């Protein structure tokens, strides 16, 4: 039958469309995806694979030591499918065409003990490898913790164009963190943070491969932790009875963090920063004197009476059972000695002990007893640097957190030279805000830039970005943290050689938009826009 003249243009149009599709299949690939933090080894290949939201799946490899019974991975598979495709599957019909080559599946293989039911620890293995090739990508990890990090990397490799088409480069990635301790400090005493805000922070931490939530849960201002052993601590020490973290709240935070490979380390700072404790626990704090007259003012914890240590023995026994991590942060910073000096009972105790007028020896006496309590509970301790500076007799393995910005490199040298593990937070106090792109200052920090042997540098187990809460609550915590903390995240994860600021800016700008698309209200780096700003 002769071809109708009216059908010829339609045929030409179809041929043109086929040609365009063919061109698309051989178009130059994106060889620089915005991976954050940047992996240890990345090989990107020019070949693009197309991904269909309707056909793609994330599954367990048949030879994996984890399987469908591993709820941690099952939940992660669902979560990362949604991160990659968003609401595409619910709001779009079938794909307009099936382009080839295509990636059909991501198989996840755990090669050693899966640790599906465990909580992460300082020694958790976060190593993974990722091979993306047609038709199946393979993610291998020794444990679920590495698999979680690899899933995040995979999700960052997938690109959606303006037509809604999903693609990924064939690639090979081998990755592991530079430091095992990569933390974010939140402060829930100066301002109470609702549980949903903490959970949102844990999500953002996972997007940036942080693995420690340092929960500075109580301080002078309020005591929101609801103790089952000493309920009056929060009944009288919290801002209000609705500004507390119940046992169920704490369990929710712990499990939410576990599912994202994040440890939760609680901090109960003593003997200073304890005004809220005294409201619910009589005779715990030191009465201050004006000459020989007792005032209504109280100072640090009273270190001279046995009831103090009996209380803390019981209290920390509860804490050690509630929080599964091997570490408890004991604080020990900024202890004011004036009240101790004014109290005649303290003066008499120091005289009997032969301490003279050196209140650092009294502080050391107290801290040593608290460290012994923690050790008796089969836990390890973290302390702020003043505890080390004031010559407290520390137990082997006590971790010292270096937070004072002056001469922190020298402090790291001293701490590690004495054989103690160290955490660096001094250059990463994110509550100190300034105009402009201050993330660059955080990014340029080199944690191991101090004089010391290789053995000393191996004692630096990582660092933390700290966001103290004097001027931060649920309304501004997220944009103040992100993406500024992302700079710290890359410094603690990526190899030492990853330092190119221009490249980092390009990747971080995309990563910031990616966080916005996932519901994280991360503030902008500079001028520009995101395609997903309506998601916030």
Swiss-Prot record:
Keyword set, alphabetical order: Cytoplasmic vesicle, Disulfide bond, Glycoprotein, Glycosidase, Hydrolase, Lipid metabolism, Lysosome, Signal
Catalytic residues (UniProt): 334 (proton donor)
Catalysed reaction equations from the record: Hydrolysis of terminal non-reducing N-acetyl-D-hexosamine residues in N-acetyl-beta-D-hexosaminides; N-acetyl-beta-D-galactosaminyl-(1->4)-beta-D-3-sulfogalactosyl-(1->4)-beta-D-glucosyl-(1<->1')-ceramide + H2O = a beta-D-3-sulfogalactosyl-(1->4)-beta-D-glucosyl-(1<->1')-ceramide + N-acetyl-beta-D-galactosamine; a ganglioside GM2 (d18:1(4E)) + H2O = a ganglioside GM3 (d18:1(4E)) + N-acetyl-beta-D-galactosamine; a ganglioside GM2 + H2O = a ganglioside GM3 + N-acetyl-beta-D-galactosamine
Disulfide partners: 70-116, 288-339, 513-530
Gene3D superfamilies in the record: Chitobiase/beta-hexosaminidase domain 2-like, Glycosidases
Signal sequence, renumbered to the chain: 1-31
GO biological process, one term: oogenesis
Superkingdom of this protein's organism: Eukaryota
Subunit structure: There are 3 forms of beta-hexosaminidase: hexosaminidase A is a heterodimer composed of one subunit alpha and one subunit beta (chain A and B); hexosaminidase B is a homodimer of two beta subunits (two chains A and B); hexosaminidase S is a homodimer of two alpha subunits. The composition of the dimer (isozyme A versus isozyme S) has a significant effect on the substrate specificity of the alpha subunit active site.
Family the entry assigns: Belongs to the glycosyl hydrolase 20 family.
Protein name, as recorded: Beta-hexosaminidase subunit beta
Organism of origin: Mus musculus (Mouse)
